[in-house]
């Protein structure tokens, strides 16, 4: 893509009053994005309103700055990590998006060169859920994603706190397992900001790892902040790109339920992991199961329902964006990731005091002492002291054999 063509695409997405429907009609009539900006006012008025015509004739005030910023973002390329601005009609543009009523005019992509083939990979599963999960929810998201990635399934999520982060981590772990397909993308993250930003900041190292072994994707221009309105739009791309969606844990309401609803409307399979009837974090999954989502207890349940997810074709012989074509990328972040696959994580868990931390780690399950210790990361004396306080205050019940459960769950 030339500089002029990139500039025309960026100008189109910045033009006030030109939404997806108008933009697609303009492209259909004029055939090329540069041609519509070279058209006469009279020709434009045959396609769009006079006010929209006036907008198209005036360069948006932020356009020059965005073009320079995007060119700089693209020009700092290395062979290890590529960047690309992929527009509607480009061979790399995900064909799955064409089924949307409002496919993005362009996407930004950043990641490992071989991973760009994943943009046309039909063997994908979205794993989504709460930003404030229980410990069991985090464990399930990680374990399901790890197992599926080991089998070659491409895990898709949104880089959010909680379940999303655990799903990406599990996929990264699974892609390193013995027997996992070689040369495949580990995971794809669809984000709700420009790709020159990371949200949440706590996932900066995770984003680094995804950029090294998978792809980060955004339809938003560089510099776009994490606006609340961006994330429901992002969810439509997750559902469109995936063959099915697994909701690990979700309350009511939840953005992950939006993704599940979109998937149902698109005829995709929706899976949900059940939880305790006492847990608010499980109510969204239970609602989905009532509406026809498939209850799953293990990752193999998903593979049994979607056998076509296996095997994933290797991505070793794939052409990635070439240097000098506005499509190669350097590492997006300067520091080197030091996150270890084996480290415990508590993404989204923020208890307010020690006893509440133990209750959060206990969740709504029957949990043994070793698991509690691993989740809390405490020395045994401190954990046992907290358990004693909770038992004396009638908040938990010892079940014998080193197992504990919250009280009031009868």
Set out the residue ranges of the language-model regions:
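Short, small/acidic-rich helices and loops at N termini and domain boundaries
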Residues: 1-92, 369, 393-395, 400-402, ...
């Amino acid at each position: 893509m030339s500089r002029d063509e990139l500039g025309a695409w960026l100008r189109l997405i910045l033009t006030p009053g030109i939404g997806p429907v108008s933009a697609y009609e303009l492209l259909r009539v004029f055939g090329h994005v540069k041609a519509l900006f070279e058209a006469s006012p009279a020709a434009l008025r045959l396609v769009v309103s006079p006010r929209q015509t006036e907008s198209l004739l005036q360069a948006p005030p932020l356009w020059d700055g965005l073009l320079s910023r995007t060119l700089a973002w693209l020009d700092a390329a290395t062979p290890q990590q590529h960047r690309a601005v992929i527009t509607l009609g480009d061979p790399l543009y995900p064909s799955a998006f064409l089924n949307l009523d409002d496919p993005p005019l362009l996407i930004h992509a950043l990641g490992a060169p071989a991973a760009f083939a994943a943009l046309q990979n039909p063997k994908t599963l979205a794993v989504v859920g709460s930003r404030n999960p229980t410990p069991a929810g985090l464990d399930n998201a990680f374990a399901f994603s790890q197992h599926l990635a080991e089998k070659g399934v491409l895990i898709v999520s949104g880089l959010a706190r909680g379940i999303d982060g655990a799903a990406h981590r599990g996929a990264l772990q699974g892609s390193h397992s013995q027997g996992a397909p070689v040369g495949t993308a580990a995971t794809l993250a669809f984000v709700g900001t420009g790709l020159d930003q990371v949200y949440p900041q706590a996932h900066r190292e995770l984003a680094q790892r995804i950029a090294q072994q998978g792809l980060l994707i955004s339809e938003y221009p560089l510099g776009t902040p994490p606006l609340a309105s961006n994330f429901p739009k992002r969810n439509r791309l997750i559902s469109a790109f995936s063959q099915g969606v697994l909701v690990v844990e979700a309350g009511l309401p939840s953005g992950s339920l939006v993704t599940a609803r979109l998937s149902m409307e698109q005829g995709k399979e929706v899976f949900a992991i059940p939880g305790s009837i006492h847990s608010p974090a499980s109510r969204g999954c239970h609602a989905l199961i009532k509406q026809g989502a498939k209850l799953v207890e293990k990752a193999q349940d998903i593979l049994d329902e979607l056998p076509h997810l296996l095997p994933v074709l290797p991505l070793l012989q794939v052409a990635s964006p070439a240097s000098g074509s506005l499509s190669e990328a350097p590492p997006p972040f300067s520091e080197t990731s030091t996150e270890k696959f084996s480290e415990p994580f508590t993404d989204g868990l923020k208890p307010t005091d020690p006893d509440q931390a133990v209750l959060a780690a206990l969740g709504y399950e029957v949990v043994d002492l070793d698991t509690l210790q691993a989740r809390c990361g405490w020395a045994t004396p401190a954990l046992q002291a907290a358990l004693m306080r909770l038992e004396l205050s009638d908040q938990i019940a010892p079940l014998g054999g080193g197992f504990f459960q919250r009280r009031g769950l009868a």
